[in-house]
């Protein structure tokens, strides 16, 4: 081993993007120790999240390793010293099937070592190294890793401090003592599209401007609303989520603004609404385009005056609430056809933020797939679950009309199919492209309407489908056709199907269509 201290120390005093610094760190360690793979994982509650890897497949960055399910990681995390697992260790390796040189195969006899990392006396995460040559991690290598641990922790501390300084500069104010910017964890992606979006969210988060999140169904608008709130000065106050499409028109006013005693039959007492519940914090109006015109007028007055009036009361009440709204509809078109108020649209869209669809996020689809693979692996009790190269290519090529939500369903369905076909849960299970069944989901341009009608008239059912499965597939097709016919409007789709909008939402969630 040649000393790598000069390179590490140079990176500590060089202004580098945090992802670049940590990637250079693990790549340098892999070269230094001449090993097969190195991973840096951050502890987040009961899971370890990879933040930089070298020698592991790309989707590893999207996975979350539950400490309780991975005894090697648990053992490393429990000690302050270096922990070594020799070639005869019986503990399962968390990276089985994920090493670049042996993708999809059980790892050959090999050595592993790792160390826990601490910042300010608290566990931060772990550093792991895997070598495919027995005897690589001898006593000298373990002692070297122990010495390097201090520099690794210093690199992480530098990265954290730089992130805090950037957040302070953007916020133009002081963070509470001992509290850095939240690391949300849920938003997975490294594409330029997602990096630009996160930067834009960071800029607007600490203002009180209304924000309108625009994006297709399934892009994760709620996650981005949560991120906005957590990075705002209101983060210590409630974030209240309102699904506007699920509000029955007769109850919408009471739900949003509250009601006085005797306002209607059954109103036996005072009841605050969602605006008052969000006092000092943020109100997230999801699917805001579904609000009826009568409620739009009252919402506009609240945004203009900062006051609400409970149903049945003539006393105005001041509210201090930031509003974030989201929609998958083209509100400008609805303004033109008179179904959405122009003045409310301009109030809500002070700062519109488009969220990119999954098809525009490049290799992010593989990181997200890694996340869902790990969730299904743990849920199904499997040793290892991964994608073949052909399956990865299929994920990249597919257009993803349902975005991240559809990807989650595709991975879950493929994992279940694999198990139902007799896959041994103790083996490394590889999902092939045909299991994803993306060819059956892809529709030629312009054929969506006819395909939906055909799906209802002649549903394509899996061989041996039960009556319940046939009914559920037909229900899905009916819902999808109604939504397409009404430009994604859940309220109008519910009316076409003869259902209450809230019941349609519940059914769609149960069927996995939402």
UniProtKB/Swiss-Prot annotation:
Transcription regulation keyword on record: yes
PTM annotation (4-aspartylphosphate): residues: 54
Any one GO molecular-function label of the UniProt entry: sequence-specific DNA binding
Induction entry: Negatively autoregulated; induced by anaerobic growth in the presence of NO.
Residue sites binding ATP per the record: 215-222, 287-296
The Sigma-54 factor interaction domain, residue ranges: 187-416
Domain notes: Deletion of amino acids 23-168 led to effector-independent expression of NorB1, a downstream gene, i.e. the need for an NO-induced signal has been bypassed.
Other comments on record: There are two very similar, functionally redundant regulators in this bacterium, NorR1 and NorR2.
PANTHER family on file: ANAEROBIC NITRIC OXIDE REDUCTASE TRANSCRIPTION REGULATOR NORR, TRANSCRIPTIONAL REGULATORY PROTEIN
Protein name: Nitric oxide reductase transcription regulator NorR1
Organism: Cupriavidus necator (strain ATCC 17699 / DSM 428 / KCTC 22496 / NCIMB 10442 / H16 / Stanier 337)
């Amino acid at each position: 081993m040649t000393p790598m201290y000069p390179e590490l120390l140079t990176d500590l005093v060089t202004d580098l993007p945090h992802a670049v610094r940590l990637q250079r760190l693990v790549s340098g360690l892999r070269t230094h120790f001449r090993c097969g793979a190195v991973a840096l994982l951050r502890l987040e509650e009961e899971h370890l999240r990879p933040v930089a890897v070298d020698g592991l497949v790309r989707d590893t960055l999207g996975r979350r390793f539950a400490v309780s399910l991975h005894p090697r990681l648990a053992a490393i995390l429990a000690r302050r010293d270096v922990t070594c697992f020799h070639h005869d260790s019986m503990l399962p390796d968390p990276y089985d099937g994920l090493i670049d040189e042996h993708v999809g195969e059980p790892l050959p006899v090999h050595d592993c070592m790792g160390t826990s990392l601490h910042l300010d006396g608290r566990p931060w995460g772990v550093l792991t190294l895997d070598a495919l040559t027995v005897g690589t991690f001898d006593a000298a290598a373990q002692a070297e890793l122990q010495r390097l641990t201090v520099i690794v922790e210093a690199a992480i501390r530098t990265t954290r401090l730089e992130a805090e300084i950037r957040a302070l500069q953007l916020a133009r104010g002081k963070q509470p003592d001992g509290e850095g910017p939240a690391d949300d964890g849920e938003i997975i992606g490294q594409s330029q599209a997602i990096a630009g979006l996160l930067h834009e969210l960071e800029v607007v988060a600490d203002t009180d401007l209304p924000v309108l999140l625009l994006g297709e169904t399934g892009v994760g608008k709620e996650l981005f609303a949560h991120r906005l709130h957590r990075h705002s000065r209101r983060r210590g106050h409630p974030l209240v989520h309102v699904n506007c499409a699920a509000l029955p028109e007769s109850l919408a006013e009471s739900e949003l603004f509250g009601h006085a005693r005797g306002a209607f039959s059954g109103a036996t007492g005072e009841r605050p609404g969602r605006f008052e519940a969000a006092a000092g914090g943020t109100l997230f109006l999801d699917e805001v385009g579904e609000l009826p015109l009568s409620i739009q007028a009252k919402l506009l007055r609240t945004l203009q005056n900062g006051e609400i009036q409970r149903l049945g009361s003539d006393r105005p009440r001041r509210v201090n609430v930031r509003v974030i709204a989201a929609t998958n509809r083209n509100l400008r078109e609805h303004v033109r056809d008179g179904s959405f108020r122009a003045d409310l649209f301009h109030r809500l869209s002070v700062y519109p933020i488009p969220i990119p669809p999954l098809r525009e996020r490049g290799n992010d689809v593989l990181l997200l797939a890694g996340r869902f693979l790990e969730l299904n692996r743990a849920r199904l009790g499997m040793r290892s679950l991964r994608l073949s190269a052909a399956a990865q290519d299929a994920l990249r090529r597919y257009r993803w009309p349902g975005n991240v939500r559809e990807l989650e369903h595709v991975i879950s369905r493929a994992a279940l199919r694999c198990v139902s076909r007799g896959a041994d849960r103790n083996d490394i299970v590889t999902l092939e492209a045909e299991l994803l069944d993306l060819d059956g989901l892809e529709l030629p341009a312009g054929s969506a309407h006819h395909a939906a009608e055909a799906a209802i008239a002649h549903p394509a059912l899996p061989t041996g489908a039960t009556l319940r499965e046939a009914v559920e597939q037909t229900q899905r097709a009916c819902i999808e056709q109604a939504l397409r016919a009404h430009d994604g409007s859940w309220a109008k789709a519910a009316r076409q199907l003869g259902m209450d909008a809230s019941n349609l939402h519940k059914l769609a969630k149960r069927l996995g269509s939402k």
